[in-house]
Amino acid sequence: MEIKTLISLEDKYIYQDAIELLNSDDPFAPITSEVIENANVKIREIAARIHHHILLELIYIYVSNKFSNCTDIMQICFNTNSICPTGLYISNIDTIPSLCEHLHISFLNSKFSLSIKSSKVRSKSKEQLIELGAVYTQSHIAKNIVDDTFANLPVPIQEAKVLDFACGTGRFYENVIPYFEDKKKGVLFNVYAIDLDLDALNITRLKALSFIDSLSKEECFTLCQHIVLKDALRKNNSFFPEPLHISPTDLDGLAEGGFDAIVSNPPYLVLKPNKSKAGVGGSDKIQEQVNYYRTCGFYQYSIEGMLNLYQLSIERMLQMLKIGGELGIICPSTLFGDVSAKKLRKHLLLRNNVRSIRFFAEKIPLFENVNQATNIFILQKGGSTSDITISEEEDVFDVNISLVKELFPENLEIPTIKSSEWDILRKLSTLKKLKQFPSIRNRRGELDLSLCREFVTSAPTPYRLVRGNMIGESEVKDINGEFVLESFIPTRSKDYRTYDFNRKRLICQQISNGGLRRRLRFIFCASTDVLGNSCNYISSDEETLAKLYLILNSSILNWRFKITSSNNHINNYELDELPIIDLDKVDATFSYSSQEELDEYIGSLYGLSKDERKLIAI
C-alpha cells in the first residue's frame, strides 16, 4: 500500500466519524455555520484518535507477521490488548515502519476541518508543528550527526550508552543501532530514546523491533524501559511524582550524568503566551510551562529572556551527559548569535569543548516543510573550547576561541560567515564602537505607538509623526497624515528635550526583514518630526551626522550588522556595537552617485581591499 492510499483511507475514516457531528434529531434541520464551527472544535480529537488507531493496526500487522508472541509485544510495548481491524493489507511488512513514519509526519503537517461544500477534511498546515515544536530531521542528516558524534566517544562503541533525546519517530535511533554488531544487544542494552508524543514513540519502538528477530516477555519490558514516554525537561520530586515527568530510576538510572553520547533535534518552540494565536487554553498552558522552567531550580543557562524549548533541551542534555561524553545537536543558528542565548552559549564555549559547528542557511532544506537557518554542533562535555571547526557551505576552517573572545568579548557570538570575512572582523576589532562616542545618542523613537495614542491626531500640528513604514530610500515618505499634539513634548525626558527635540536626526526602521540584502538604511528626518517607536534614531551635531550618514549607509556597516543580527529587529544595543572609524578622517561633504562609489570611499577608510569590499557588497 502506498502512503497516499493510506492517507486517503485515514481521511475517509475521519470524515465518516466527523460527519456524525452534523447530524441532529431533526433530519431537516439546516446545517448552520455555528453547527460547523462546533463540529470543528471536536474534529481534531477525532482525527487524532483515528490516526492513533491506524498506526496501531499497522504495528499489529508488522508484529503479528514477525513475532510468535504478538500478544505480549502489543500489550507491553504498545499498551493495547486488541485491535479492531479496518481491513488494511500490506504486501511487504518491511515497509510498515516507514509507512507509519510518513503517515505521522503527514498528520503533523495537517489541519482537519469540516465544510458543507466538500468531503475533504485535511489541509496542509504547520499549526501542529508550531504548537509541538516538532520538526523531524531528514535521515541522512541524522546519520551525519551520529557519525560525527561517535568520532570521539569516551568508551568503545559496544559499551556506550547512547540517548536519542526528543526522539520523535526515531530518525537518530535508527542510525545509531547499526553501529552495534549485535543489534539486539544495542536495542536492549546500549541505546535509549525519550519523547512525549505517544504515536511518534510507538514508531520508534516499532523501528527498534525491526532490528531484532525475537523478543521475550521480559525483553519487552526492557525495551519499554529504554524507549520511554516521558517529558525529559521535567524532573519528578519525591513528594508529588507526575507520571510523565522523568524520575531518577528512568532510563536505567542514567538520566543524571550517565550517557556517553546524546544526539538530538530538540523541539523548537518559543514559549510566548499569546491568546490571539494559541487561544486561552493554549496560552495558559504555555504560561504554566514558563513558570515551571523559571522556578523549578533545574535550569541556570536557558531561562533568560523569552524561553525556547531548544535551549532548555540543550541544557537538560548536558545534565544527562557524562563528563567527557559527546553531544551532537541540530538546532536554530540563533544559538550562536542571538543575545537571548548568550548565557547558554557562554556555558557551552567556556565550560565545555565545542568541537565543530556547521552552519546552514535558511534556503537549505534540512527539514521537511520548514525553512530555518540552522546549525549542527558537536560538543564534548567538560573542559574548555580551543579550536572550533567551522563549516559554512563549502568553506571549512578553524576559529580559535581566543579570537571569538577578542572580537565579541561580551556575548561570544560566532557569526555565520566565511573564513575571509573573519579577516575583515579582525580589522574592525581595533575601532571604537558607536556607544563609545559620548556626543552621539542612539535611541528608540520617542512616541510609543500603543501607550501614547492619545497624543496622535490627524489634525495638522507643528509636529509630524514618523512611523517606520515612512522611511524610504532617501527621504521620509509622507504617507500617513498623522501629527503629534504639542502637549506630548513636556511628557518626555529633559535629555530628549535638550539633545533630540527640534533637531534633525538620522533615522532607520526598527523592523527590517532578516532576509534582506540591505538591513541598515539611514535617512534624515526633519527637525520638527516626532518619531514613533517603530523607528530608531541617532542624534548629534550636524557635521557628525553627515559623516555618520555616509558610514551607516555603507556596505561594510550593513554587513557588520547582519552577521550578528539573528532576528528581524534593529535593536539599539546592536547599533551600539557597530565599529566607527575616526570621524576626523571622514569628509562630511563627500558626494557619491552609486553605492559602489560610497563603498570604495568608506571601505578605504576602514582599510578594506578591493576584494574585501566586493565580498561584503550589498
Stretches found by the model and what they are:
Residues 79-148, 529, 557-564, 572:
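Class I S-adenosyl-L-methionine
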Residues 102, 106, 110, 144-152, ...:
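Generic, well-ordered alpha-helical scaffold segments in large soluble proteins
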Residues 554, 578, 584-618:
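Amphipathic alpha-helical coiled-coil/heptad-repeat segments
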Residues 1, 307, 311, 318-321, ...:
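Polybasic, glycine- and aromatic-enriched phosphate-binding surface used to engage nucleic acids
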